[in-house]
Amino acid sequence: MERGSLLKAKAGGKLHGGNHGIAPEEVVAAQRARMSVGMIEAAAQKGYAAVTVADVLERAGVSRMTFYQHFANKEACFLAAYDMAVEIVMTRIGAALAAESPALERIDGALDAYFSTLAQEPEVAKVFLVEVYAAGTAVLQRRLATQAGFVDAFAGALGASLPDQRVVAEAVIGAVVALATNRIVAGDFGALPGLREPLMSALITKLVRQDPAGS
């Protein structure tokens, strides 16, 4: 798969002036998607703090009036961009966790999907795990909720329902995120897929031994 292809697919084609031949709500959705992609690209390249609304307009090919019809400010646009980044990453993880296979195989597939998606989509990765910290309280709260969702998904896949098991699941997800973030900050995207195997070992020793059904 081409690097960055998942993000490019979200942008779609540019709409030109006049009659688009599509429903108004589809035009609105397409404009919002292009601005979200534009924010992801700009934040990944410049850092969120340095991004201006003009940067997003240039990449999305929309007017300033259109921008403010969708978003109150830059932070609101970034929140939509972050949600898009989450969707790109979680779609592949969700498919792996929903597979009809033993717990360990589903967890292995989810980790593979997580690291391979971040490696394939470097701009998404930067927004998802790095620039999110610079974008304000509302976005940070969304990021914490996203990580809690990861913990729920992993704990659920392994049947980790006891409080102590939940803490271990939280620690494992914390390690996954921290290791990925360190590589992304360093620009070492190629190293991301190689993190899966050692983390699987940690999952085996910390979680699966507490869940006979998953062994």
Annotated model-derived regions:
Residues 1-30, 158, 211-215:
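N-terminal intrinsically disordered/low-complexity leader segments
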Residues 30-41, 45, 59, 76-96, ...:
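Alpha-helical structural segments
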Residues 42-76:
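Helix-turn-helix
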Residues 52, 126-129, 192, 215:
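Short, hydrophobic secondary-structure boundary micro-motifs
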Residues 93-96, 100, 128-132, 183-187:
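Secondary-structure edge/capping motif, primarily at the C-terminal ends of alpha-helices
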Residues 117, 173-190, 202-214:
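Amphipathic C-terminal alpha-helical segment
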Residues 118-137, 181:
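Amphipathic alpha-helical segments used for helix-helix packing
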Residues 136-171, 178, 193-201:
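Amphipathic alpha-helical packing segments from all-alpha helical-bundle domains
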